[in-house]
A protein has these predicted regions:
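Zinc-dependent deaminase catalytic domain
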Residues: 1-416
Length: 416
């Protein structure tokens, strides 16, 4: 990019331009820009891509539940950091049209960027209560958020005072009431319809057929095996009650991830029939926010997106008859999200963005874990979930829980 911003107004307007592009794409109307604090240079500007056309096809739009502008900017930075000789994250600011959600706030804190914000999101934003105390952020990270996040002042007739840290690009500055209102209203005009389309993008399991019974030459079956070569190798008789049958997959995947420099963790995804469709580790060696959960939810969404837009109608119909929204499946992680870290906040937020609304069956939870990180209790994990912004606690009702099968817990623990 060659654009430069001389002040907060110009920076937010660059991001606002991206939010307009997002609105025209019929996805969440949010945009962001990565600014070099010293020069004001716009290094990267991206908008939300949760819903996106597939090669001009509009048949199925749910592309990536984690493709919020801020998350994409973080991954863009780590992908291009060496090639472009980019400054350290602490010398850069992500300027966003909307208060980051839990996932994006966790991603930004993990990466170490400064953050400048225009509009508030009282439902899913990390500063939802507008008190600047960040109750959803792990306690030891709240002071970090208070020094690295900023909410620009707004001129008359809004008259909002600047609140935030001094390290953010264009600290202490204001933006126009016009720009502030644009960034808020354009998001509000899109949010409910996008959430509804996402949350309802799949059939009830009672109307599905088991993908395990697909013929070997099925395009859908091949796509699932391409995403995870061991798909269908394990079946849990009761998908919400996973047992020892998934222990080996979780452990082996975590070990492989760790050997290449990622965290020792893995996440399995079981479909409504109990089939193990995915079990992936993270890619933190590439980007610190590419955790195992992020990799799994993105892989499942991408596979559906490609298949549901396939040029062959019979493939599309078959995909729609065997694959559905992940709210009907079960995510099982080897280790729970760590409530003491921003990665933990990000993971719970990403789960909320994956569900994007109510879950039909809330018990047992469809967000489960086998083991707890050292020094973390089940109560700690639940406390973080209950402290998330209202969208996550009232609509999604995020409720991570430990698997109920003691044999699975013991087998994995004894194999470490």
């Amino acid at each position: 990019m060659t654009k430069k911003a001389a002040n907060a107004e110009q920076a937010v307007r660059i991001a606002a331009g991206k939010s307009i592009e997002a609105s025209l794409q019929n996805t969440f109307a949010v945009g962001g820009v990565l600014i070099d604090n010293r020069s004001g240079t716009a290094l990267c500007a991206l908008h939300n891509n949760v819903l996106e056309d597939f090669e001009n096809s509009k048949l199925f739009l749910l592309h990536d539940p984690t493709a919020h502008g801020e998350r994409q900017i973080v991954d863009w930075y780590f992908k291009n950091r060496k090639r472009l000789n980019l400054p350290d994250p602490g010398k850069l600011s992500v300027i966003t049209t909307l208060d980051p959600c839990a996932m994006c706030a966790g991603a930004l804190l993990t990466a170490g960027f400064n953050v400048g914000v225009s509009a508030i999101d009282n439902y899913a934003g990390i500063n939802y209560n507008e008190a600047f105390d960040f109750p959803s952020v792990p306690s030891r990270w709240r002071s970090v958020a208070q020094s690295s996040f900023a909410y620009y002042g707004v001129e008359a007739p809004i008259r909002r005072a600047y609140r935030g840290g001094k390290r953010v690009a264009f600290a202490k500055q204001t933006i126009s009431a016009f720009t502030f209102c644009l960034t808020g209203t354009i998001f509000e005009s899109s949010v409910n319809s996008v959430r509804a389309l996402d949350n309802n993008s799949g059939q009830d399991p009672s109307k599905l057929t088991n993908p395990k019974n697909l013929p070997r030459n099925s395009t859908v079956r091949k796509a699932l095996l391409d995403a995870y070569p061991e798909a269908f190798s394990v079946t849990c008789p009761k998908p919400r009650l996973p047992g020892t049958e998934i222990a080996r997959a979780l452990l082996n995947t975590a070990k492989k991830a760790h050997r290449r420099g990622a965290a020792f963790n893995s996440v399995a995804f079981l479909d409504p029939f109990g089939n193990l469709l995915l079990c992936l580790g993270g890619a933190e060696e590439r980007s610190p926010i590419r955790t195992a959960f992020m990799e799994v939810t993105r892989a499942y969404a991408h596979t559906r997106w490609v298949l549901m837009n396939h040029r062959d109608k019979s493939v599309r119909e078959q995909a729609g008859n065997v694959l559905t929204h992940p709210k009907y499946g079960t995510f099982v992680s080897l280790y729970s999200p760590d409530p003491n870290t921003p990665q933990g906040l990000m993971t719970m937020g990403a789960y909320g963005s994956t569900m994007e609304g109510p879950i039909p069956e809330t018990f047992p939870s469809n967000l489960q874990y086998v083991l707890l990180p050292e020094g973390v209790s089940q109560a700690d994990v639940s406390e973080m979930a209950m402290g998330l912004p209202p969208f996550y606690t009232t609509s999604v009702q995020v409720a991570p829980s430990q698997v109920l099968d003691e044999g699975l817990i013991e087998e994995t623990r004894s194999s470490l």
